[in-house]
């Protein structure tokens, strides 16, 4: 999360909520869950919530097997290490206010129906259990969400002259790449490509998918391979062939799902015809 906040400092608001897995007196879960939450909150009273939070997370192996009494001693020692007023921390740690706070956090989680931790909600949507919370996935969701602000609501109007020859130049780190656009063969694709280029869609993007001996793919500002302009247009099947290196075509996720992504062949690819 720290990496995400660093990458998107003006676009993410991170809200943390405790869900200490306390359990019930009859069926307790984690004997140190409540005290962990209380420790972070006690440190927070001195402006060091995240320092204690991070120490608990990073050093879990050191304290997870301790007794509750020894864990409390560990917390007090850690409070001194991170620069807290230890006496105040010790008083706050087991105060009735924080004991009640931890219990309420558990009760609220139960009422809400939380299944466990970690539990993540992004813009009101629960993060699916079958998708890992690794950085790439989280960053992709942020990038795709931000892309929505740039997307269009419909296909561009047809403005090109299908009798003319159009040439586009890709400016890359390796030098310029000139592309012939066949308006007579693929008017929808050419019209869309020019429209997107004129609106800065392709500025500063990368080739997010490069397969040596096959293709290099670009056209997604997020670099995830899932981004598009907000509209689709139909396939245009012509007599043109992917019979040599340097042929450009539209990349899609199935019939008639063309958008902004395109590929350039490294070698003949008759399977793409």
Report residues per predicted region.
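C-terminal cap of thioredoxin/glutaredoxin-like
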Residues: 1-6, 73-158
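Structural alpha/beta surface segment adjacent to cysteine/selenocysteine redox centers
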Residues: 1-80
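Short clusters of hydrophobic/aromatic residues that line enzyme substrate/ligand-binding pockets
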Residues: 63, 93, 127, 231-235, ...
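Extracytoplasmic/secreted cell-surface and envelope-processing proteins
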Residues: 22-26, 64-65, 128-131, 258-259, ...
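Glycine-rich, acidic and aromatic/proline-enriched surface loops and short helix-turn segments
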Residues: 45, 58, 80-85, 255-256, ...
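Cyclophilin-like peptidyl-prolyl cis-trans isomerases
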Residues: 136-273
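A local structural motif
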Residues: 12-13, 85-92, 176-178
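Stable alpha-helical elements in mature extracytoplasmic
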Residues: 32-39, 48, 52, 71-78, ...
